[in-house]
Amino acid sequence: MSAYRYANLTNTKYIPSVYAVMATAGCDDRKIKRKEKGKRHAAPLSLMGVHKR
C-alpha cells in the first residue's frame, strides 16, 4: 500500500482519514489514492519511490 506509506511519511494528520478509507473500501489502494488527490496534489508514483529512500 504505497499510498498509505506515502501519507505516513509526509503528513501525519492525513492518517486518520486513511484508516477511515481503509475501513470503508476494504484496503482498496485505488480508492485511497483517489482520496489523496482530494486532500492535496497527489505525488506521482516515481516521486513516492524517491520519498521512500
UniProtKB/Swiss-Prot annotation:
Give the region (Disordered) as residue ranges: 34-53
What name has this protein been given in UniProt? Answer: Uncharacterized protein TP_0871
Q: From which organism does this entry originate?
A: Treponema pallidum (strain Nichols)
Kindly list the organism's lineage: Bacteria, Pseudomonadati, Spirochaetota, Spirochaetia, Spirochaetales
